Amino acid sequence: MREIVHLQTGQCGNQIGAAFWQTISGEHGLDASGVYNGTSELQLERMNVYFNEASGNKYVPRAVLVDLEPGTMDAVRAGPFGQLFRPDNFVFGQSGAGNNWAKGHYTEGAELVDQVLDVVRREAEGCDCLQGFQITHSLGGGTGAGMGTLLISKIREEFPDRMMATFSVVPSPKVSDTVVEPYNATLSVHQLVENSDETFCIDNEALYDICMRTLKLSNPSYGDLNHLVSAVMSGVTVSLRFPGQLNSDLRKLAVNMVPFPRLHFFMVGFAPLTSRGAHHFRAVSVPELTQQMFDPKNMMAASDFRNGRYLTCSAIFRGKVSMKEVEDQMRNVQNKNSSYFVEWIPNNVQTALCSIPPRGLKMSSTFVGNSTAIQELFKRIGEQFTAMFRRKAFLHWYTGEGMDEMEFTEAESNMNDLVSEYQQYQDAGVDEEEEEYEEEAPLEGEE
């Protein structure tokens, strides 16, 4: 029933993916080997969205793990939940892509892609009613970015009417892993604009900030960052995995969130976020969750939505929450901060409810927003891209793999178009009262 096939590519994608499976296995009452020992019927009811049932009460993730070098996969296999995955679903090369998008997309990755598609096909054929695909990857590297986007376009060709959701880790403004990130990211965005239905943008720097500022961790590890990402992924997919009063699936989310097909890049947030010692001192209530989830400091992508306006957004509440209270809070947010929502889409906040909270919490909320402020992120990458491309720096690594400079120029202009489309809709319909938007006031209820 409404299955999702999950792919994780590259080092970043595999690490986030592993954290995600760890989180949802826990929520569904599965232990590290996939055996069910939960307590609630509700955990089993929609288990098959993400898991295949094997013999002996064992559940196996419908996940395909892809990388161009064996290292990360070995780490996943040796990790706490390594025995969960089906061994045939590990597909890896030996050479690595070396942070080179062209290697992932055209040479090394292209050699491996048919093997991956065979596994994807096998998983898809086992589904009653395939809903779509989700892929975790980063946009700054070689495998996740290059091969990830190659897989997306191949899957798109073969399953044109299924949803394609991506959880994409975008390069951060200050924390850079490799010098060619702007190239890889721009080439990837060029692909995602055309081939993905919904892209959840996550960036490491915003995650670092959340870890340090809100969770009070002095030096956060990648494990801590991945934990945050998996909380969001779990929240976005919760209404697919558990029955709730107001359910949404990938397609409903897309219908509500994407006003124009190209503008499908979302900012995500999660609440409650409290430091490890402090959660005993806070009562979690719907108003509190709402305030925290609309707080720009809690966004997991480094762009401040106060510099733009929301086209649409979606709030997913979990736990024992009252429907009326949620509706009131949502109306409240829209009325008090109406300048942050475009006025030509009335009621542009969608809510979903699910009665099962995440482990260890009474209630939580996940936020997905389609804000025009995401253009900051693309602008920033575009500027870095242009700075290097103007000098043709590092280009030989890409042309050596058979790429053409023309492709870079196309990707650059596609990204610039995307930025100006966001800008155009941000300005739309406010011609008369242009002056009011000069000074940006902070959101109500936060200093």
Curated annotation (Swiss-Prot):
| Cofactor(s) listed | Mg(2+)
Instruction: Determine the domain of life of the protein's source.
Output: Eukaryota
Q: Per UniProt, where does GTP bind?
A: 11, 69, 138, 142-144, 204, 226
Species for this entry: Neurospora crassa (strain ATCC 24698 / 74-OR23-1A / CBS 708.71 / DSM 1257 / FGSC 987)
- Could you tell me which Gene3D superfamilies the record lists for this protein? Helix hairpin bin, Tubulin/FtsZ, C-terminal domain, Tubulin/FtsZ, GTPase domain
Q: What is its main location?
A: cytoplasm
As for family, the record states: Belongs to the tubulin family.
What's the stated role of this polypeptide?
Tubulin is the major constituent of microtubules, a cylinder consisting of laterally associated linear protofilaments composed of alpha- and beta-tubulin heterodimers. Microtubules grow by the addition of GTP-tubulin dimers to the microtubule end, where a stabilizing cap forms. Below the cap, tubulin dimers are in GDP-bound state, owing to GTPase activity of alpha-tubulin.
Q: Which UniProt keywords apply?
A: Antibiotic resistance, Cytoplasm, Cytoskeleton, GTP-binding, Magnesium, Metal-binding, Microtubule, Nucleotide-binding
Does the UniProt entry include the keyword Cytoplasm? Answer: yes
**Known InterPro entries for this protein?**
Beta-tubulin_BS, Beta_tubulin, Tub_FtsZ_C, Tubulin, Tubulin/FtsZ-like_C, Tubulin/FtsZ_2-layer-sand-dom, Tubulin/FtsZ_GTPase_sf, Tubulin_C
Pfam families linked to this entry:
Tubulin, Tubulin_C
* Consequence of substituting residue 167 to Y: Causes resistance to the fungicide benomyl
Q: Give one GO biological process term.
A: response to antibiotic
Q: Where does the UniProt annotation locate this protein?
A: Cytoplasm, Cytoskeleton
State whether keyword Cell inner membrane applies. Answer: no
List the residue ranges of the region (Disordered).
Answer: 424-447
Composition bias (Acidic residues) maps to 429-447
* Name used for this protein in its record: Tubulin beta chain
Q: Which gene encodes it?
A: tub-2
